UniProtKB/Swiss-Prot annotation:
HAMAP family: PSI_PsaJ. Keywords: Membrane, Photosynthesis, Photosystem I, Thylakoid, Transmembrane, Transmembrane helix. Gene3D superfamilies: Single helix bin. May help in the organization of the PsaE and PsaF subunits. The chain crosses the membrane at residues 14-34. InterPro entries: PSI_PsaJ, PSI_PsaJ_sf. The keyword Ribonucleoprotein does not apply. This is Photosystem I reaction center subunit IX. It comes from Trichormus variabilis (strain ATCC 29413 / PCC 7937) (Anabaena variabilis). One of its GO terms (cellular component) is photosystem I.
Length: 49
């Protein structure tokens, strides 16, 4: 079993990398949606008949 120092370093590493990874993922997703909407307008919204 890992000692306390290893566990706290893993926690600090997770806390510092999780927001960075989430931010990068959201920026990429937003970019894909923006470019899709630029090349194919009106395909992201389908009004009800």
């Amino acid at each position: 079993m890992a000692d306390k120092a290893d566990q706290s370093s893993y926690l600090i590493k997770f806390i510092s990398t999780a927001p960075v990874a989430a931010t990068i993922w959201l920026i990429i997703t937003a970019g894909i949606l923006i470019e899709f909407n630029r090349f194919f307008p009106d395909l992201l919204f389908h009004p009800l008949p």
